[in-house]
Amino acid sequence: MANESEIQKTENAEVANAANGTNPNNERRGRGGRGRGGRGRDGRGRRDDRRNEEAGEELIEKLVHINRVSKTVKGGKRFGFAALVVVGDGKGRVGFGHGKAREVPEAISKATAAAKKTMIRVPLREGRTLHHDGRGRFGAGLVYLRSAPSGTGIIAGGPMRAIFESLGVADVVTKSVGTSNPYNMIRATFEALNDQKSPKAVAQRRGKRIADLFGRGGASAAKAEAEAAAVVE
């Protein structure tokens, strides 16, 4: 009888906990596992945002592509979303990131955070175009980049336009062949941008003056040196 009484008390306590929406065991797992982990991940994101605000850094964020994905598990399929985001400061720095999550906003947030961590600096001529032509390849994708005179605008489409707008380029001519996959186009474009070198960097690597690279003399040489000094690496 004593055992039956104890069992009955235990069952009554469990029913009361369920009615009140409390469960000591589940509550401990929430604090020690998912709860604390969730706060940690969200907390890091919020701290990163605060650091950007404190530094006065304003970033341009562009959603390039989003698609639905699925993962086959033992119980069936789990559906989610994948986002591709490009981030830049409009002053020569740009990055891209990819994120997956069950919900669209969370996928975009993950992609944005990843893009901020992979930003690269691209030297720009006069702060508006590339220093020289370039080419990049990734997978089946091949992209061509050409510097352009003032007033040309951004001749690019889709993912490539988002990159140059975020980068701060005002005049450029591009062409993409071989693929329409936005991921391949983005990676091929970044490969081409990574190969961009300013006259200042080339002169330092070769141990020459800027004017020597262009074969200039007199006032033209002084102008070339001044233009090179104004380039932000």
Swiss-Prot record:
SUPFAM superfamilies: dsRNA-binding domain-like, Ribosomal protein S5 domain 2-like. The keyword Repeat does not apply. Residues 1-54 are annotated as: Disordered. Keywords: Ribonucleoprotein, Ribosomal protein, RNA-binding, rRNA-binding. One of its GO terms (molecular function) is structural constituent of ribosome. One of its GO terms (biological process) is translation. Pfam families: Ribosomal_S5, Ribosomal_S5_C. Residues 1-12, 39-54 have a biased composition (Basic and acidic residues). Residues 59-122 form the S5 DRBM domain. GO terms for cellular component: small ribosomal subunit. InterPro entries: Ribosomal_Su5_D2-typ_SF, Ribosomal_uS5, Ribosomal_uS5_bac-type, Ribosomal_uS5_C, Ribosomal_uS5_N, Ribosomal_uS5_N_CS, Ribsml_uS5_D2-typ_fold_subgr. Part of the 30S ribosomal subunit. Contacts proteins S4 and S8. The N-terminal domain interacts with the head of the 30S subunit; the C-terminal domain interacts with the body and contacts protein S4. The interaction surface between S4 and S5 is involved in control of translational fidelity. Belongs to the universal ribosomal protein uS5 family. With S4 and S12 plays an important role in translational accuracy. Located at the back of the 30S subunit body where it stabilizes the conformation of the head with respect to the body. This is Small ribosomal subunit protein uS5. It comes from Zymomonas mobilis subsp. mobilis (strain ATCC 31821 / ZM4 / CP4).
